[in-house]
C-alpha cells in the first residue's frame, strides 16, 4: 500500500475513534440507583443540583408493587393523602404498574431551578406504604 494511502487510512481510523469517544462523552447525566423494598427507599444519592440531568435506575426489590415520586413531604395529619391530590403535587411519578415486584425502571429527569432549596422526598404513596416509612428526604440545590 502506498505511503499516502496508509496515512489516509490511519487518519480515517483515528477520526472514527475520536468521533466515537466524543459521542459517548456527550451524555453528561449523573447516574443514581434507587432501591425500593417492603417498605423502604435507598438511594445512591440524596443531594441533587437543579438544571443537571440525572438518570435514575429504580429497582423494586419488594414483594408488592410500588410507586416512585419526587414530591414535597406530607404535612402532619395528611399522611393518608392519596389519589389525585398526591399525584398533583408530585414533580414526577412512576406508577405501580411500571414497578411490579422485581422490575427495574430507568427514568431521566432534570430538577427545575424552581425547586432549588425546597424540601422534597423520594416516596411511595401506595396506600399504607408512606406511613410504613417508604420515603427518603432529598435536597435540591
Map each language-model feature to its residues.
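Bacterial signal peptide processing site
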Residues: 22-24
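Beta-strand signatures of extracellular beta-sandwich domains
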Residues: 67-71
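Short aromatic-acidic-glycine turn motif
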Residues: 74-85
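Extracellular/periplasmic metallocenter environments
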Residues: 92-141
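C-terminal motif of bacterial Sec signal peptides marking the signal peptidase cleavage site
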Residues: 17-20
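Asparagine-centered strand-capping/turn motif at beta-strand->loop junctions
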Residues: 58-60
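Bacterial N-terminal signal peptides that target proteins for export
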Residues: 1-9
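N-terminal edge beta-strand
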Residues: 27-54
